[in-house]
Amino acid sequence: MPELPEVETTVRGLVPFLEGQRLAAVTTFRPDLRRPFPVDLAQRLTGATVTRLSRRAKYGIVSTDRDDHMIFHLGMSGRWRTEGGEPGKHDHLLLETGAGHRLFLHDPRRFGSIDLVAGDPLASFAAFVTLGPEPLSDDFDAALLARAFAARRAPVKAMLLDQNVVAGLGNIYVCEALNMARISPLMPAAGVPKAKLAALVSAIRAVLTAAIAAGGSTLRDFLSPDGDLGYFAKDWRVYGREGEACECGGAIVRVVQSGRSTFYCRKCQR
């Protein structure tokens, strides 16, 4: 599933094609993805001008001068493509601009979603109401983690994947950050020493910043809007590297936590 860096890469890739552009036509090629498209999607967006593109957690937001906001989630296999042409088998939504750009939402597995809200999307979209802070914002710090982790027996990895604790983190980048901070993903959250919480915050910021700069990670389906791969996968410290050597010299192992693969080094992550 695309995580924060992939969605940020997508939003940045859409800006040159959508921001400041009038939406000349909006076309859906099926009635639904994970859930139905909004019935008034085309009516409310056609003729509107896109004023801003932004991101919250793993969602992208397309805002218009009508104070309508189209919120997209890429699901497991979704991506936007900007090369134009005719719709393909797995293209389910088309945005056409007055400048002639044709942007397709491509989603083979159809686990993505499109929502449309009026007014402030951060206040009016239900999925945003309980989200934790953005990990690259000033609101995310060691004190916040200390409060969230207090008396919690759940593994630290599970807590970091909880979108109510911190928004946008997923399996890949949590594995990477825990390795950088030298913290075992199996450790109960309450057991993480306070001295290590600042290191964990720094590691999360560093991993996400590097991943965004590299265009995210391509695991199976993800491509940026212009069709580029996400090159951060070449720099993974532990993710997907079972049996290889950690930079400390220890062996990277894979375990399963809550149905997800966890990669870490038993030598340096304690």
Curated annotation (Swiss-Prot):
Q: Which residues form the active site?
A: 2-3, 58, 260
What range does the record give for the signal peptide? none
What keywords sit in the KW lines?
Answer: DNA damage, DNA repair, DNA-binding, Glycosidase, Hydrolase, Lyase, Metal-binding, Multifunctional enzyme, Zinc, Zinc-finger
Question: One Pfam annotation, family name?
Answer: H2TH
**Required cofactor(s):** Zn(2+)
Please name the HAMAP family in this protein's record. Answer: Fapy_DNA_glycosyl
Summarizing the function annotation, the protein's role is: Involved in base excision repair of DNA damaged by oxidation or by mutagenic agents. Acts as a DNA glycosylase that recognizes and removes damaged bases. Has a preference for oxidized purines, such as 7,8-dihydro-8-oxoguanine (8-oxoG). Has AP (apurinic/apyrimidinic) lyase activity and introduces nicks in the DNA strand. Cleaves the DNA backbone by beta-delta elimination to generate a single-strand break at the site of the removed base with both 3'- and 5'-phosphates.
Query: What family, per the record?
Result: Belongs to the FPG family.
| Protein name from the UniProt record | Formamidopyrimidine-DNA glycosylase
The source organism is Sphingopyxis alaskensis (strain DSM 13593 / LMG 18877 / RB2256)
Q: Which gene encodes it?
A: mutM
